[in-house]
Amino acid sequence: MGKIIGIDLGTTNSCVAVMDGDKPRVIENAEGERTTPSIIAYTNDNETLVGQPAKRQAVTNPKNTLFAIKRLIGRRFEDQEVQRDVAIMPFEITKADNGDAWVSVKGEKMAPPQISAEVLKKMKKTAEDFLGETVTEAVITVPAYFNDAQRQATKDAGRIAGLEVKRIINEPTAAALAYGLDKGKGNQTIAVYDLGGGTFDLSIIEIDEVGGEKTFEVLATNGDTHLGGEDFDNRVINYLVDEFKKEQGVDLRNDPLAMQRLKEAGEKAKIELSSAQQTDVNLPYITADATGPKHLNIKLTRAKLEALVEDLVARSMEPVKVALSDAGLSVSEINDVILVGGQTRMPLVQQKVAEFFGKEPRRDVNPDEAVAIGAAVQGGVLAGDVKDVLLLDVTPLSLGIETMGGVMTTLIEKNTTIPTKKSQVFSTAEDNQSAVTIHVLQGERKQASANKSLGQFNLEGINPAPRGMPQIEVTFDIDADGIIHVSAKDKGTGKEQKITIKASSGLSDEEIQQMVRDAEANAEADRKFEELVQARNQADHLVHSTRKQLAEVGEKLSAEDKAPIESAVNELETAAKGEDKTEIDAKVQALIQVSEKLLQASQQQAQADAGAQQSQSTKGGEDVVDAEFEEVKDK
């Protein structure tokens, strides 16, 4: 059985780990980094760049460089959070035919799972290069507060990337696994505060050890799937734009190129201010008007940054209070606090968390890598490589159906341990009703329309009867991935209807299969592109070495011998600029054939040079005089 890798598919950065023996190991990517920016770029020559190469060219290609796609995954275009992003993202967010939020690149609509799959493919390749074998299975993490649609979409991304997603696990739970695996015996309750690039989660987790087996049980979870480092960056960017407008009278919001430079500079300034008290944001030639070029140079202090984002940090504390209340615990009952996600490096965040819990958070957990490490541990558990670890996760939101009067009737309460199954009997609302519609909802509001609609289906063929008489049993079944299956059964006729909840929109199986085929076709195109680049490199090398030989020994060849070589060199040089690998290969062979005499002349010259060097060293030896010395002793 192959390895099951663990992938932290992050909003800003992603990370991959695997069990190496009995220890989890984070794998470095091709650039030598342990994390990979979750950035995808589509270039003008139809190349797809992922990670650092995509980030490097973002300034010159803002409309086709996609980032923070996780904020769109499994979301509707009309969602309030999506509309906020539409206003600030340099790329185009568009409405799909099914109402989902998609992205438009070069006139082509793309689904977020399709784009996220590019990052997953990079993670898969990173693991394969390290392991030296093909990887087909993975555990992928999601924010604990992701709803069913977002979990489904993440699974779809895995399928498109050619991975069988063995388990979807929650990020804070994964971090707890990473933290608790090597800790000593004893029971403890920990809080995982996970503030990443685009999402925030707080989970209360109990780690118990019974008979050598460690149980990680999630007691409660809460969060905000649209709060993270990107929002902190946007506050900095807006401040810089407003300051520049005050100084220069120019609004940079209409200039995508300038905004992309500002995004990069804003993120860099925010990171610097975690260790420094002040930084300069210096962007020469940010724009120009009739009076000439304009330069941006603004000082940003840590105090100013904290004032800009204070409400965001305060917003993160609300889910903390709710989770503690749901778990039935007081702050004093929390033994340890773990910080996860790059944004938790900000001193203000650490300070507020310490103030709330009355204790300093742990410093021995790497906030960027803990989630991927935990995912790898779970992969090891599923593969049978890691023993004596049991993970008990929860469903983050309540689940139920719409009943008479537009009310949501809850079947499964939030923070219920999964997998779980629950049934309840309902009846008809009208006399002689022959069908019922089961409308599945997720959320905490009593009003059905205020919750997330997960989908609906009909149960037909109910025998005519007075209202309230038929007995319809509705069963909710949540699997270990947090994916929901719902069935409805008429107890009178035995008729049953069941569905696995597909998001009320989401991708159909046909669309996913098409995207898998597209990804495979892209892999073939990538392979051909790599072969073309290798052929070009070989051609360039041959052109260079042939010209060098012509310069060194060309005078020893006749004009008739020299002309076809020069002609073949020029033809190969032209072919190397084209896209046809077959033609490049043919011209390489042609040059090798006509260069035979040049090669002979070059070898003769090399032999002559070697002979001259040998005779020179012999000649040098003739000047040596042999002499005998005798020891003269001092008298």
Swiss-Prot record:
GO terms for molecular function: ATP binding; ATP-dependent protein folding chaperone; unfolded protein binding. InterPro entries: ATPase_NBD (IPR043129), Chaperone_DnaK (IPR012725), Heat_shock_70_CS (IPR018181), HSP70_C_sf (IPR029048), HSP70_peptide-bd_sf (IPR029047), Hsp_70_fam (IPR013126). Pfam families: HSP70. Residues 600-617 have a biased composition (Low complexity). CDD domains: ASKHA_NBD_HSP70_DnaK-like. Induction: By stress conditions e.g. heat shock. Disulfide bonds: none annotated. It comes from the Bacteria. Keywords: ATP-binding, Chaperone, Nucleotide-binding, Phosphoprotein, Stress response. Residues 600-635 are annotated as: Disordered. Belongs to the heat shock protein 70 family. Acts as a chaperone. This is Chaperone protein DnaK. It comes from Histophilus somni (strain 2336). The gene is dnaK.
